[in-house]
Structure formats: C-alpha cells, structure tokens
C-alpha cells in the first residue's frame, strides 16, 4: 500500500511494523528517495508523555551522556490471538490467524518499534550515531508451542519465534541498546524504556522514576534540588518538579485534545504532528531511514540466532549520511506561519463543507449505496461525476471569499 501511494505521488504513513524484512526496508527507502516523498512510520510510543519528557531531559543533559538504553514490547496476547485477521483464501488451515501464524513461521524481534523508537531518538540514531552490530538470543518456544497444541490439537514441530527474544545493538560511538520481545508469557505490559547516562538514569516501568547524580543538574534548565544522589530515586516532590519543568511543547499543544482517544492520546498527537509537518513543509519526526532501522531487527535477529547468536553487521540505511545532522530534534514553524496555516485550514474546511452541500454529495452517495439492480450503475456514475467536481468547486469558493 505504501509503495502504491508513493508511486502515485502521495506521501505514505505506515502502521507498525512497517517493513517485515530487509528487502522491504530497502524497497521503501529506494522508492521514497526516487519519488522524493515521505514514508512515515506510525510509531505512537514516541509520543508518550514520559518518553517525551525524558527525551527533553536527555537533550538538556540531565542524564549526562546517555550510553545505554533498553526498550521492549512485552504484552501477553493470549486473549487476542483469535481476533487477528484470518486469511480468507484458506492459507491458514489450522485457524491460527495471521499474527500467531507469523510468529510460528518467523524468528527474531517481530515487533521492535514500540520499544526501539523512543530510545533511538534519545540516543540520536541517524543524527550523529548509528547501529553497527547486532546480536540476538531467544528462549525456546514453550508457550507458543503449547498454544498451538491446545488450539489445533496438533504438535508444533517447528515454532520459529522464541517466547522471549533479546536483541543487543552496539552503535558507532560505542553505546548499547537492548530490546526485548515477549508476547507469549503472562506478565504485566511493559515497554521497559530505560536510559542509562553518565549522570542519571530513567525508567518507566513498573513506575516512572528518575535517579540523578548530585551535580547532574548543574548547567541544565532543571529546577534546583538539594541532597540528591543516584543511589535512590527522586522523591515524589522532586520528580514532580522535574516532570513539570520538562513538559514537552508538542504534548502541550495536542495532548489534552486527544487524551480520551486511542492509547491515551498518543495516536492523536502522532497524527497531529504528521499533518503539522506536512502542512508546513517540515522534516517529519520519523523518516523512512528511522523506519528501516527500527524494523530491521526481525530479520537481522533471525540471522544472528540461526548462526549460534553470532554478531551481525547492521546495514547503514542512510548510505553514509547518519552523521550529517547532529542531535535529534523536532521541527517547528514560526507562530506567524502556524496562524496563517490554521486560517487557511479553517477556510478550506468551510469551503469543502459548502461544496459538498452544493453538489449534494451525501445525497448522491446514499442513493448510490442504497440502489439495487440496474439503477445502481446509474446512481454510482452520477455520484462519481459530482465527486470529480469537488476540488474545482472548493477552489472556486475559496477564490470568491478571498
């Protein structure tokens, strides 16, 4: 779908995991570069409140130099396996549904981006550093094989995905990232999100905590705190002060509107940022190279584990440009540009509503939808003819109101 979009002149935004193997990663990179169109990975966890505040702290030096990070997707899915899509073409004779079938047939971290995306941003991956080496190790499939046996009555001789997979990556600057994947064993939901720095430490699960060295806050924008050391976490008052200071401007702008929507508002913030950057012609928060880097763990991990957990060279998806930009940042328009764009968006929306009413598109759509037999073809053509005039009608209304 993403390839079709770019081949037809449209930017693409893909749900995770956006690419299932290295070939797909390179295909999307090649096409994005060829068409000069964006290919955005819809990684909503990069917009979580704790992750974004920790990113600001890391950028301000609160943790010193971040030298190690951990992320994960630990989410027991036993209640959900049978609700995933089932192939209607009878390619799933054991009724496993796509996700369990994919886990059974593939090794490696198959859902790495929730854990990897936020920590990769904190470690400036592709903005001054990159992954160079990967090693992966997994457990045997115990719970996976048992689920297949229980639900199909058959022994699963070959279940590729281990119940728990651990992937270690070393960067060009000598830092390390650990990513875990476990969708099989019973335990609380956990994305880990841990940052280890030369002056501090952040951890999100099971509770959001920070440990800061006594001199870590000197020279930063953090509020002054007395009697702190890294042997214990900040107390509730200190943590609150730190979190208040590093409220992310993106969340300040969008989070409240989306708080009651998908995943606590992360989806809304992510979609809003995508639209914002496209409207203003700004670099997206995550690009096609990030997408490839984060999605490559599946096949690279499988190669490592199929070769006795050997070290594997990580591809340079940027083709040598990973060190051109120094430090991860979000792009922003000026307040004047934002106001101008908001005014145009409001005017366009009003014009669109007016045009739809003038062309009677909803009435024609309902008529086509409800028509039967020979009348359906005529009703559909009538709707399509009117719909084809929508853009020109909108432009006409906008010109009149200028």
Q: Which functions belong to the PLM regions below?
A:
Residues 1-47, 61:
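Beta-strand-loop-alpha-helix segment that lines the small-molecule cofactor/substrate pocket
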Residues 3, 29, 55, 116, ...:
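Non-transmembrane alpha-helical segments in soluble domains
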Residues 38, 45-159, 274:
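Predominantly a Rossmann-like dinucleotide-binding segment in NAD(P)-dependent oxidoreductases
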Residues 77-79, 185-188:
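Short glycine/serine/proline-enriched coil/turn segments at secondary-structure junctions
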Residues 120, 188-196, 203-206, 213-402:
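C-terminal helical cap and adjacent loop that interface with cofactors, partners, or active-site loops
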